[in-house]
Regions:
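Helical element adjacent to the flavin cofactor pocket in flavoenzyme catalytic cores
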Residues: 93-150, 154-164
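A short catalytic or substrate-binding loop motif that flags glycine-/basic-rich loops and adjacent residues
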Residues: 43, 133, 195-198, 207
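Central helical "cap/lid" subdomain
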Residues: 144-196, 207
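Dinucleotide-binding Rossmann-like beta1-alpha1 core, especially the glycine-rich loop
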Residues: 8-91
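Short hydrophobic/aromatic beta-strand or adjacent loop that forms the aromatic wall/cage
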Residues: 48, 92, 178-180, 199-201
Length: 209
């Protein structure tokens, strides 16, 4: 959840993956599942606009339309000039995609976990050592030691730190810095999300409910 929260808390429908139909289709499937399971934390009342840049984009408007049709996700043409200066984007599309309020979802999960007597959450702890002890995995973090038959590595960008402790080969991950700015917009953009594809461009999304 932290990774998605940092990445604008977007509930992906698949539009970000015009060069991977399988990823887009999986995203659309999980989009429906997330909306069904966690609809209480969603922000849905805004226009989600995707556009393809006329310059330096790996995907043009025609390709984006074909991709959306193949993935069976919404893609309604709107005039690019409604949102952009003339000549900047060769296609602009109204789509279906939402954001979620991570604080609302976090509170819900904490309430669910608090009801489980065998769950303990440790904050501000990093594992010092991970080792296999017979049929269980033993994780040591300072003075705390826990054992479990399975480990789930959900560290996202820190996945290779855990791999190193386990003696596993690292994933070939490329890290990129990204600036996320919280700002107040005027009324023209208050109920609009805009994402320019497909390259080193920008995205503007509503944040929270």
């Amino acid at each position: 959840m932290r990774a998605t929260y940092i990445n604008q808390a977007r509930v992906h429908m698949g539009y970000h993956y015009p060069r991977s139909y399988s990823t887009a289709i999986k995203s659309a499937h999980y989009f429906e599942r997330f909306c069904r399971d966690y609809g209480f934390c969603l922000h849905t009342e805004f226009d989600q606009v995707y556009a393809t840049s006329a310059h330096f984009s790996w995907t043009n408007a025609a390709e984006f339309r074909r991709f959306c049709a193949a993935a069976e996700i919404r893609c309604d043409d709107v005039p690019p000039e409604k949102y952009f200066n003339p000549g900047l984007c060769d296609g602009t599309f109204l789509t279906t995609e939402y954001t979620y309020d991570a604080q609302v979802l976090k509170r819900w999960f904490l309430e669910q976990l608090a009801a489980l007597p065998n769950v303990e959450i440790l904050y501000s702890r990093k594992p010092d050592r991970i080792e296999q002890a017979g049929s269980v995995w033993r994780v040591t973090a300072g003075e705390y030691t826990a054992e479990a038959p399975y480990l789930l590595n959900a560290t996202y960008a820190g996945v290779n730190d855990i791999h190193a402790m386990l003696g596993l080969p690292p994933f070939g991950i490329k890290y990129e810095k990204c600036e996320i700015i919280l700002c107040t917009v005027d009324e023209k953009l208050r109920n609009t999300g805009i994402t320019v594809m497909d390259g080193p461009f920008f995205s503007l999304m509503p944040f929270g409910q």
